């Protein structure tokens, strides 16, 4: 039997890996950071060199990369991704948490993927006003994998796709947890704190409010396939 000599391929070898971008989107409390951590640890088990980058201004859970339930991982804090490009070039897998806060996220991820890195980004897709958060959505057409997670609505316990701000701040970047934000469903997004629907013609809500917030209109009457008298006539005939 003849033997075939296979080349020695080491995990993380720049000449053997194929770059890609994976994007994890969703509202707050949907498990984005948890999923990012799971994927990075999966590569670590396979002996890949990994680097996690976190937003430097988010100091809620010390300098570590942390999920809301306090699972932590070593991370490199940064405000601009170009400031850590040398560290990123020394690894095979790059995880980026709170990707929506980095203004150079698209350029960085594309360059790293083109150089053979696997880049995994966890980010909010929308602001508290349900508008695109920074340039993060520009990653979608560049990514090999995109997933949007949902949370549990913190007001009615249904599926939640949006982030609702509890305070009155108007600026987009306000870092906080459950003290400042709720994950909410479509209906609860448009409710005021009192539980009443938002006013349709208010300047703050008119752009995002649906056309109707009351009870959905009843569907027109459906014609029955077999009326009662039709069934009775058939019985008499038999």
Swiss-Prot record:
Active site: 98
Record SUPFAM superfamilies: Glucocorticoid receptor-like (DNA-binding domain), P-loop containing nucleoside triphosphate hydrolases
Record-listed ATP binding positions: 26-33, 58-60, 97-100
Membrane keyword on record: no
Keyword set includes Plastid: no
PTM description: Phosphorylated on Ser-13 in mitosis. Phosphorylation of Ser-13 by CDK1 during mitosis reduces homotetramerization and catalytic efficiency when DNA replication is complete and intracellular TK1 is still present at a high level. Polyubiquitinated. Postmitosis, ubiquitination leads to proteasomal degradation. The KEN box sequence located at the C-terminal region targets for degradation by the anaphase promoting complex (APC/C) activated and rate-limited by FZR1.
EC number: 2.7.1.21
Alphabetic keyword roster: Acetylation, ATP-binding, Cytoplasm, DNA synthesis, Kinase, Metal-binding, Nucleotide-binding, Phosphoprotein, Transferase, Ubl conjugation, Zinc
Positions of post-translational N-acetylserine modification: 2
Role this protein plays: Cell-cycle-regulated enzyme of importance in nucleotide metabolism. Catalyzes the first enzymatic step in the salvage pathway converting thymidine into thymidine monophosphate. Transcriptional regulation limits expression to the S phase of the cell cycle and transient expression coincides with the oscillation in the intracellular dTTP concentration.
Database matches in PANTHER family: THYMIDINE KINASE (PTHR11441), THYMIDINE KINASE, CYTOSOLIC (PTHR11441:SF0)
Protein name in the entry: Thymidine kinase, cytosolic
Provenance organism: Bos taurus
Chain's gene name: TK1
